[in-house]
Amino acid sequence: FQQFEFHYSADPDTIGKQVAADLALVDELIAVLERQREAGAGRLAGKATVADLAPGARFLDGWTHVLMPEPGRAYELTVLGDLHGCYSCLKGAVMQARFLEKVEAYRQDPERHPNPQLVLLGDYIDRGIFSLNGVLRTVMQIATRAPDHVYVLRGNHEYYIEYEGRIFGGVRPAEAINTLKPHLPMNVFRRYAELFDALPNVLLFDRTMFVHGGIPRDRLIKERWRDLSTLNDPEARFQMMWSDPSAASVIPAALQEQTARFPFGRLQFAAFMQRLGCRALVRGHEKVEEGFRRVYDDDAGLLVSLFSAGGADNRDLPPESSYRSVTPMAMTLRRSASGATTITPFAIDWRSYNDPERNAFHRRPPEITHKVE
């Protein structure tokens, strides 16, 4: 980790070189996703539910990852919700899970070790201080070094808009882009926008769906749904980055249409899970104070909200951040060789990685001041 823990410089020549290295990583991750897409193109067509996917299937079709467990194989998924520039939370969780060690052990002897996977639910940037040069840079490093073990899903903050030759953050405030705009040309953010557009939205693992927000609107499901390939519908992908579960049983379609961020009810969730053939949905998007919450958990299915940014005195957050009230959490999903699945949340040890001895970002103050607007 430490070789990549450096602030962007305020010196134009130095930051130019730093950003060039980061954009090379952007290109590398896009190339990984393009190769995966080419190999998996069209494989969801005609598949009504996950039961129609072959055991052991692993592919990326469009913007939907599929990982169906091999019979007799164990899996261990480390899952992180929104990180929002909290680099210490990312590093802490990956180190606690010993994820990189487990990848190496699995590569050396896959018969004796569970298959380790890292699932990232999106919202890597904004709010916290270490967005593009902390969380996203490191996520790209891990994903390009272990592409068979890392799923980088898109959050609603990974959304840039171009208007009249200028790039804007799609969510306000957009601290990551606002902080760096005075120091970098627009083409840099155009390249990040290309990366964001390339990021997948969904992972289907066994009977669990991983997504940033939630399910599409009722109207889209009724009018457009064909089979699992509809998960790649552009409007469905956008809606799944923005929706939230509610305490209601059903949210009327007219109410869902009122805003980009919209609610869905318990029965709507249950119907969508049945449509997919899934039993559970794991998502981020929503700040939950306890970091991990079983929102729905009954015979119709399980919905978990996971939030991995926060910490009362986390130096990765601005002093006024509302995320200081959050206990940042991660979770482990284990699937045994016999098919039994368990979900275990764990508190992220971010404090250890606020220590300058363990996190070079905190050895000196940033040269560029974090900017909200």
Which residues make up each language-model segment?
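Feature recognizes metal-dependent phosphohydrolase scaffolds
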Residues: 1-373
